Regions:
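A short, glycine/small-residue-rich beta-strand->loop->alpha-helix junction that serves as a flexible
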Residues: 17-30, 239-240
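Conserved nucleotide-sugar phosphate-binding/catalytic loop shared by glycosyltransferases and other
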Residues: 10, 15-17, 35-90, 94-96
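Conserved nucleotide-sugar donor-interacting segment of glycosyltransferase catalytic cores
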Residues: 100-169
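A donor-sugar binding/catalytic signature common to diverse glycosyltransferases
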Residues: 292-337
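C-terminal amphipathic helix plus adjacent low-complexity
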Residues: 363, 368-420
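Donor-nucleotide binding loops and adjacent catalytic segments primarily
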Residues: 204-303, 336, 354
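A nucleotide-sugar donor-handling region in carbohydrate enzymes
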Residues: 144-239, 270
């Protein structure tokens, strides 16, 4: 472990993810922050996160986080405190104050905001206003996954909440973590007109850590039969899918010739996880919570079963594994849209919510293990989004440094003004 006793001249970058549901926002920002910390050796990346489990993923030297009070998304635009018994207004005030003070003290040269331009409840607005008033104003970037919701739903919500005006006023660039040829995020969500010059399609943000070969991991897991890995991402909404999968294994019986590993994710409720463990008794099935080497588990599989969340699906496609995808039925159209698009390209197989039953799943498990017609190779599928995002941020940091050479901060008693 490294320790740093001097203040130094670190390049400061801040990221924000509300993390009101799942790990997708946190995973993207963590991956980009890790790449940036390696590419810019003097950088410090401070992540503002809301995940109830903390940072979850390994952080390299140069990356740290501040945990905001946890909230949970109950419906589109509806958020509630998750753990503290202090009421909605106090939770809002505490998050706003924590963010604002972190921004003031850390004094970032770049801010990367994932998914929600003004934060939940508009909690980023005071900090965005403060940053824009600085004479050495940082680069402010909005990062968006490829598919947010049905276009009409997102457009209506953004119009209602003043999101377009906030993007116009505060954001210098918009990173799209996807491919325009596969899904035109800009056109779908009204960002292709006056905002077109800010848009950068960077490809998919996938974990860049090394992973073990299929043979090595299977030996480590002592697997001799066909292996099915069932993963639920963060796990907050994975129980219904995993319960159906467990029932499908019961349909197949203990002599199916399959070995199955469930990775529930750290956000699944404990009672739900224990119920799965009870059902797994007598089957060739293991139920795990969270594994650091998630990619190696997926790579060891003959078939991966997952939902259609951003991280799980794109890691699956990056590994070029057979994947049976069970998209979440709602509340947004994100997962069903993504599953349909990638099934049409021959990259995954899909069981749609209306088709879901233990018998249907059992048939799919066995059929997909024997199929040889997928996944197809798709040359447009670029998984270097984290590197491209880090490269773009590094370019902006260099430009900011050059433009700030005439600036110095005079620190006196109670004085933190910027002079040119």
């Amino acid at each position: 472990m490294s320790y740093f006793e001097t203040e130094g001249n670190s390049t400061c970058v801040m990221t924000y993810s509300h993390d009101g549901f799942g790990l997708g926002h946190l995973r993207r920002n963590t991956t980009i922050a890790s790449v940036l910390a390696r590419q810019v050796p003097d950088s410090s990346v401070l992540m503002l996160i809301g995940c109830p489990s903390g940072a979850v993923f390994k952080l390299p030297t140069g990356v740290d986080f501040i945990k905001l009070p946890s909230v949970i998304k109950r419906n589109t635009g509806v958020w509630l405190p998750m753990r503290l018994r202090i009421g909605l207004e106090k939770t809002k005030a505490l998050r706003v104050a924590t963010i604002q003070e972190a921004v003031r003290v850390f004094h970032p040269q770049a801010l990367l905001v994932d998914h929600v331009p003004v934060g939940i409840w508009g909690e980023l607005l005071p900090s965005l206003q403060m940053l824009k008033r600085r004479s050495d104003a940082p680069t402010i970037v909005l990062g968006l996954r490829d598919i947010l919701d049905a276009p009409e739903v997102t457009r209506t919500l953004w119009e209602r909440d003043g999101t377009y005006e906030a993007i116009r006023r505060y954001y210098d660039e918009i990173f799209i973590y996807g491919h325009k040829e596969i899904f035109d995020t800009g056109a779908s969500y009204g960002l292709d007109g006056e905002f077109a010059s800010k848009l950068h399609y960077l490809g998919y943000v996938c974990e860049q850590e090394p992973y073990k070969s299929q043979q090595e991991m299977r030996q480590e897991l002592q697997v001799e039969n066909k292996l099915v890995v069932i993963t639920g991402g963060g796990g907050a909404d994975a129980f219904p899918m995993m319960l159906e999968c467990m029932k499908a294994l019961q349909v197949l019986g203990g002599n199916s010739g399959l070995e199955v590993i469930f990775i529930t994710g750290p956000l699944m409720e404990g009672g739900q996880r224990e119920h799965l463990r009870e059902l797994a008794k007598g089957l060739q099935a293991r139920v795990l919570v969270h594994v650091d080497d998630h990619l190696s588990y997926m790579n060891a599989a003959d078939l991966v079963v997952t939902m259609a969340g951003y991280n799980s699906l794109y890691q699956l496609i990056r590994l070029r594994k057979k994947g049976l995808v069970i998209p979440r039925p709602g509340p947004s159209a994100e997962q069903q849209t993504r599953a349909r698009l990638f099934a049409e390209r021959g990259l995954v197989d899909v069981v749609r919510p209306g088709e879901l039953s233990p018998k249907r799943l059992a048939e799919k498990f066995m059929d997909d293990l024997e199929r040889t017609d997928y996944p197809l190779y798709d040359p447009t599928f670029d998984t270097n989004g984290s590197r491209k995002a880090a490269d773009r941020l590094a370019e902006q940091l260099t430009a900011t440094r050059v433009s700030s050479t005439a600036c110095y901060r005079e620190r006196g008693q109670g004085d933190t003004r910027i002079y040119r």
